[in-house]
């Protein structure tokens, strides 16, 4: 049998052993996908149910609004008729009539919106197969589908639980197999311990220097963004600032350098970077948002209000106080200020006043862009009112500009408008009319909130608090970091500072070493280009070595079916107690040693080379006795591993030369014959004792099997007269196929059964593998292919089929 055929047999065995894992993994993935699809369908069905509920609510609102509209129309018509029939209508009657008309118009607008909403919902429901004219029937059908989908989801989840349980069982089998190979892994670990220590030390050193490496990378990026020389005063100042922030705050120097890059990309110069970096870091620690978001907001407000670099810290404090004193969060405040800040600057409103307006609107649940557009509309309408807005303000007696044409303080204007409403005792409808005329439909609600906040003094209090907020962000960060988490961050920052300092000291040497290595690699590349043939030969040799390593690794997989068989023995005899389990595990570990890597063997040999040289002959005599004792005790078990022997023949031949060279290298020291005999006898005794311990599970299993056979015989399940059928069938099988020829159908040598895991004979019976031969002589001879010849073949085949049918009917066969 060739080496390629051997490898194919091994790979096929591995594939068959791993097939249950693959099938269960595939089933698990399929079930998970089905569950996701069912969950998606269930969400869609629940969405349809929500649409039905929304349609009903909207329809109910439409009906109520329709009744109210009809009533308002009747009242307006009655008032109009009364007003027309009155000779001298009063001003109060005119106002009442106008109010009734406006109420009817508002109800008509609301009725139209609800009608459009109902039609839109009808179209959406129709798109998913729900008819609103037969809503109760379709809703019941939808509920039935939801119930069916829910039941299907529960069934799929139960199936997934069962598959997961099977996966857990197979994983337990695999873990037992891995435990059997643990001894081989320990041998490999001994050989790799020195390399592992060196690698761990190297990785620890690299990890310690990594903060300095990353800090240097970010400094180079910052230098490229701002466009200055590496040794310039600007870069030195920025680097010094980043290091100081890393040493004195919870942020690291790497974080500070990252913030500097973000501010530089936002358009900041060196002075702006130095001013904004500490503020950005503190804001990020305080509001737990990214440095990119905080830097963008900070620099955006600085640009919108056209403030100098020395005001950047104050801007950060105002923003932090806004989030702490009002209901505004980071996203809402950022969106609102994006809309309001440019208009506020043109209207002469400070950043503190703008933040107060945004915070007050967030307290009233007008958030994000709605707060921004509302504030912007209020500022722009009051800064330069035109048309009806101007007339309305004039009627209220409110001036928006002073004698020089400059816009008066916005808060003062809002207070005067609220005071005018109260002075003239305007009703809510009249106030709403003025608000819509002055500020527009969308901004009227925001204007009402701001007028109330201005009249109650809330805006003034917030503005005063924001103006006195210097240093509040740093104070907030100190409070938030005054705990174990903050101490850990400070420790991490200090640790990274150590790595940065070490990297700074070694950067020159490391760069020189790397550059030198690069030069040598380039020289090697040039040599390869000049010597293509030789380089190709080296590549072929390396590929052959890799293939040899793969073959040796595949040989280790032979242990899998053997371990499976031993596991089956342990499972069948588990009731025999902890002693059997312990010894059975020892057997499993011993067989797992088949897969010892060659590298681990070499490492073990090298580790003990000096001791072996000194005590070579006593050691060799001792282990020679051990091997002799093991061979004598394991002779009956040898046939079990006979199919594995040819696999190791080729590997043994290749290693024999290397082993002979190693023996010659360590020139053994001679010992006396008596000493060697004593060592050999001791080895024989040790080997026999070891073999007895390893044979204990098999002996116990044989006793268990004998007991089961006795019970089955007494019950009449088996017949003792059939004891010799195994030997008879084996002789027939050997005589039929011969010996020494490879049979691909069973992947084994003739005369040996293919390996199967050993199992307890619970309910199994004899499988007839004999072959019948019939010799029929006819006088006169019969040529092959004639009608008589075909009739004989048909008769024999029919006889064989009937025989197999009778055997199956008797229930005495497993096949």
Swiss-Prot record:
The keyword Coiled coil applies. GO terms for biological process: viral tail assembly. Residues 67-163 form a coiled coil. InterPro entries: Phage_tape_meas. Keywords: Coiled coil, Viral release from host cell, Viral tail assembly. It comes from the Viruses. The keyword Plastid does not apply. It holds the Pfam family PhageMin_Tail. Transmembrane segments: none annotated. Belongs to the P2likevirus tape measure protein family. Serves as a base for tail tube protein polymerization and acts as a template for tail length determination. This is Probable tape measure protein. It comes from Escherichia phage P2 (Bacteriophage P2). The gene is T.
